[in-house]
C-alpha cells in the first residue's frame, strides 16, 4: 500500500533568507552590504582601516572571468593582481580566507576532542558533533530541528575567524595600534567576498 503524504505547508518562518527564490525580502537582503554600500564607505574612510578577505571559491571565479587567455595562473599571483587593484580602490589589507579556514578547522578539532573527553567524564557534551561553515544550514537547524542544536559545534566559521583576524590583527597593524581594543575594532571596516548570499546571515 502506498503511504499518503500530508500537504506541505511553508510559511515565512521557514525562510532561510537564501537566494533560492525572488521575493521582496531577498531584494532587501541583496541590497544590504552591497557593492554600492562598500563604495560609499571607501569614499568616506574617516581614518578607518579597510580590510577585505577573499574566499578561494571567489578567487577561482574571478580567475575564470578575468583571464583573457586560457593558461595556468597560481593562486598567489592571482591574489597579488587582485590585491593591487583593490588597494587602488582604497583597501588597506587584502587577505586570503585560507588562513581563517585552517584556524577554524584546528578549533573544530580541539572542540571535538574536548567534547569527547567531557563525555567520558560526565556525559555533559553531546556527540556526534555537527560542524558546518554554512550559516544557512545553521539557520535551518535553529528553525526546524532545535533538537540538533546541542550537537552543533560552537566554534566560529572561517568567515567569523576572518572577522576576528581583521579586527584584532590586520586592522590594528594598519592603524598603528600597539594592541587591539574595542575602539580600534570599531575603526576597522571588514569586507568578505564569498560565493553565497547565505553568508550575509552571519555578517
Predicted regions and their residues:
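Iron-sulfur-associated redox domains of electron-transfer enzymes in respiratory
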Residues: 1-203
Amino acid at each position: 500500500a502506498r503511504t499518503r503524504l500530508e500537504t506541505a505547508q511553508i510559511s515565512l518562518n521557514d525562510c532561510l533568507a537564501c537566494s533560492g527564490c525572488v521575493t521582496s525580502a531577498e531584494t532587501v537582503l541583496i541590497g544590504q552590504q552591497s557593492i554600492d554600500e562598500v563604495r560609499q564607505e571607501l569614499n568616506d574612510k574617516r581614518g578607518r582601516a579597510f580590510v577585505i578577505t577573499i574566499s578561494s571559491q571567489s578567487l577561482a571565479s574571478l580567475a575564470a572571468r578575468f583571464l583573457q587567455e586560457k593558461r595556468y595562473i597560481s593562486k598567489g599571483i592571482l591574489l597579488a593582481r587582485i590585491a593591487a587593484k583593490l588597494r587602488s580602490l582604497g583597501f588597506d589589507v587584502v587577505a586570503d580566507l585560507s588562513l581563517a579556514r585552517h584556524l577554524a578547522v584546528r578549533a573544530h578539532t580541539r572542540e571535538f576532542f574536548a567534547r569527547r573527553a567531557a563525555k567520558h567524564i560526565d556525559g555533559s557534551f553531546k556527540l556526534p558533533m555537527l560542524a558546518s561553515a554554512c550559516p544557512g544550514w545553521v539557520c535551518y537547524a535553529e528553525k526546524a530541528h532545535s533538537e540538533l542544536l546541542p550537537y552543533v559545534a560552537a566554534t566560529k566559521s572561517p568567515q567569523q575567524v576572518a572577522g576576528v583576524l581583521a579586527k584584532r590583527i590586520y586592522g590594528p597593524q594598519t592603524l598603528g595600534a600597539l594592541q587591539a581594543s574595542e575602539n580600534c575594532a570599531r575603526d576597522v571596516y571588514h569586507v568578505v567576498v564569498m560565493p553565497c548570499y547565505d553568508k550575509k546571515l552571519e555578517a
